[in-house]
C-alpha cells in the first residue's frame, strides 16, 4: 500500500487585519504604496481611509495636516535605477504645495529631456529627524529645508573604468533650490 501525505495543508489564507487588540497597539494609520494605484492610507482595522492616486512614493510619508510627501513617478528603468522624477508635498486633495526636481537635467534616449530629483529611499524635512511620527518632532509643512538622498553619475578611474552610480545628500530650500 502507498503511504499518503499526512501533512495538513491550509485551504484558507487570511488577508487583511487578522487580530487587532486596541489595548496592545500604538493606534494610528499606515501609509503604503500600492503599485499602479498610489499611496493608500489605512486604519488599524485594515480599511482604506484615503488614496492619493498616481503617486509613486519611495517612500510615502504622512505629515501633519494631512500632507503627503511622495514622488509622482520614476525614471525609465533602462536608464536609471530607482530614480524618482521629483519629490513633492501634496495636500489632502492631491494639490502640489512643494516640489523638488532640480538635481539633474536628464536626456535619456527617445525620451524628452527633463529635470529630475533622482531621489530614492529617504528624505527628511526640517523639524523631524526621524522621518516617522515622534512626539515633539513634527516636520514643517509650510517652510523649512529638506534633506534628500539622491543619485548622481560619477567617473573615478581609481575605482572602475565604468560609470558609477553615486549617492549624494542634498539640502534643499523651501523654494526648491539646492543649498
Regions found by a protein language model. Name each.
Residues 1-179:
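Histidine-/acidic-rich catalytic cores in large beta-rich domains
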